[in-house]
């Protein structure tokens, strides 16, 4: 995984190293028996930094291994969001549509929806828990920093549309008080909220995809999710 920014030659060398590792990994993986009655899946990782030709080359190489699914790495490392989306779209144009596409280390709620629209199926990210520990929660109306003074006397629910029990149990003012007092309960409440919000967002995205209304819903949601309240 290359940092951002990195020069073309470094990105190219790193990509080829990834491809060499991949062959050895596949050989080892396929020669290893599963344990305890469970089998694992192997997702090779597309690299290439923010260089379109390298991403295309890597995606073609990765797809040629015909594994159970495919991953996209080396994004969300500091590059502008428009570059992330451009690279995602480039790679998804090559990776087979009938196998899961996993975008690693992404991202904000807006990032998730925009990348789903480009063909991504799976994500992982520390953002909902890490940001929660620092007082930031994601809601259906936008992002809130609970440490800000504006929430000191706000006794409304964390998220009036939230689906977690903490949303209807605790107020913004109370959770802000917990953070200001360095009470661990504040971090726990914010973490529970953010994890449930991310789960709800993905559940709703799946529903909208199945109903054929994803694009309209996504465009509406992105405008709200991008707000800092």
Model-identified regions with their sequence ranges:
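C-terminal extensions of enzymes
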Residues: 1-7, 159-229
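Glycine-rich phosphate/ribose-binding loops and adjacent secondary-structure elements
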Residues: 32, 37-158
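Surface-exposed helix-capping loop/turn segments at secondary-structure junctions
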Residues: 28-38, 99, 205-217
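Conserved active-site and cofactor/substrate-binding residues in soluble primary-metabolism enzymes
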Residues: 13, 20, 82, 86, ...
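Alpha-helical packing segments of well-folded alpha/beta enzyme cores
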Residues: 14, 18-21, 25, 58, ...
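Active-site beta->alpha loop and helix N-cap motifs at the rims of alpha/beta catalytic domains
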Residues: 1-23, 28-32, 39-42, 46-53
